[in-house]
Amino acid sequence: TEPISQIVKSEMENYQYTVDDLNTMYGSLRSVATEVGKGVVAVHSIQHQVDWFDNPIETTGQYAGVLIAKTKTEALILTPEEAIEAADSIEVVFQDGTVVPGKIKQRDTVANMAVVSIELSALTNDQTKKLTQVELGNSYSVKQGDMVIAVGGPAGIVHSTDYGFVSYVVKSVQAVDGISRVFYSDVQSNSGMGTFILNTNGQLIGWVTDKYDRE
């Protein structure tokens, strides 16, 4: 008799997908992206300068970040290193418009990423309870052909979203003090602003970088 796995595979290959099937599938992905989107924030990099007439001016750069951890006193946000590189001060803006000061917690010049912290005392109890932490996934489980979701700023705007597939996986890429795992995807992306890659369970499995574009 034919193995059950072969029967299932054959049936799936012969199944004719309809527009309704496609809408249902993307509806599920949209739900995942919407839920994770609650943990996406805007990170404002503020520089204090003076104009030609010695008048103080403020310039602001905007980046995307994701809330990756929360303790009793602070929340930690992963964001591109560029967001903190020349910042005199940092502001974190939540999806509901709440603005709180941030401070540099850690930076990784190899990965070009940084962690910004905010004090939970700057939020109300209700706001603290509503903080949505993005769950960390296992990037080593990513396989070629996997569907992925991009959140953060893939379209160059914070809180934009895109969907795509993993095109290729490089399991061992030499990096400073270790080996990195890199995968390529066809999702729209903006590495400078901050684009974060999720699996279909809504878990963070990576972020977009342009370091390996020519390799």
Write out the residue ranges for each language-model feature.
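Short, small/polar residue-rich loop motifs at catalytic or cofactor-binding pockets
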Residues: 60-62, 86, 189-193
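N-terminal activation segment of mature serine protease catalytic domains
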Residues: 2-70, 76-77, 89, 143
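Short, conserved beta-turn/loop elements at beta-strand boundaries and strand-helix junctions
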Residues: 48-49, 60, 70-72, 85-86, ...
